[in-house]
């Protein structure tokens, strides 16, 4: 049987980090087994579902590189199908109409709570065999078995079972003809021939109800795998403040999609002590039943380390487009400065994110805005002008502007003046960047460009003369 997995987000919000991990695990399981990965948009919550959220989910999936093997399935385009299946259950005596008012249902709930029982529908309409009538309270309820147990072997959690007496007759179709969650997903997974249902463990309590529906429909039962939660760094439930953000906010923060994928896969799965995987290695090695049953903790420092690894090792040509995007987000005209690939080579060892890289790269694309006064006091003081003037003369006279020629000019300055290279590099570093920290000084000057470098040296000389 061909493995078919699905990711089924609800477009009531954007794709968050937990959803992205679920999608990744579904994708990897299907790819390893040469199966199919499908996408379903569960958009039946008409009040909260938005097209903007749908677009954002699709965009995030594309950014992460999680391709799917058929056009997305939209639940709102399948309302007729849900009604057909509900009608079949009615005809077979496996479901029934109920017309209980909200007040009646609230009274049932309150009565159960007063006696310390679990709130549940009391089955008042189960045996009444009520006919269809036009009523705003009309729902269709599933006749859940009263006896026996529901048991299944979860690929992650192990054996799970529950007595049917713990379950009530759930609503499967609302008054407006829209399905409830538990009904829709069973019909969808059946029609989509899903073989493995991989989802968060917040759905475990839904699974016994869904299994009873599968049995009632005579549908083949998929295998279930319920993923543990992702907690924040303190072990609490994730919030937007602690990491449960829209996946695209990680892009905006400067993380690479393959770095995020590499990090996410390790939140619950491992292959020995190996930390870094390319995508093909993940496809070859990942197995859903190897996922840990315990909750994982988000570790932003580890994500930063993984991202930095790829910044250091990826081909600069592949990093250039996302760096350009980050520079443009800062209002920078990239054509006004050095090649992005050169910037990457200069900064890749010094930053963890592309956002940091873009911030540090501003010195090569924008006029120097300010000086670090501590750096000025330490390095732009009387006497420093000699080295700056000599370096300026040699830089201005270079036949071609290359990093090697710039380096030679600076070393020649130190040799000629019989001073250490630091006596040349540090005043020049402050003149060019406004600070006393930068990449290799020759590379820093080279990326600034001849005209702009000379202009900044002149400004530093004026600053020294007026100190």
From Swiss-Prot:
GO terms for molecular function: ATP binding; glutamate-tRNA ligase activity; tRNA binding; zinc ion binding. Keywords: Aminoacyl-tRNA synthetase, ATP-binding, Cytoplasm, Ligase, Nucleotide-binding, Protein biosynthesis. It is an enzyme of class 6 (ligase). GO terms for cellular component: cytosol. Belongs to the class-I aminoacyl-tRNA synthetase family. Glutamate--tRNA ligase type 1 subfamily. Catalyzes the attachment of glutamate to tRNA(Glu) in a two-step reaction: glutamate is first activated by ATP to form Glu-AMP and then transferred to the acceptor end of tRNA(Glu). This is Glutamate--tRNA ligase. The lineage of its organism: Bacteria, Pseudomonadati, Pseudomonadota, Gammaproteobacteria, Lysobacterales.
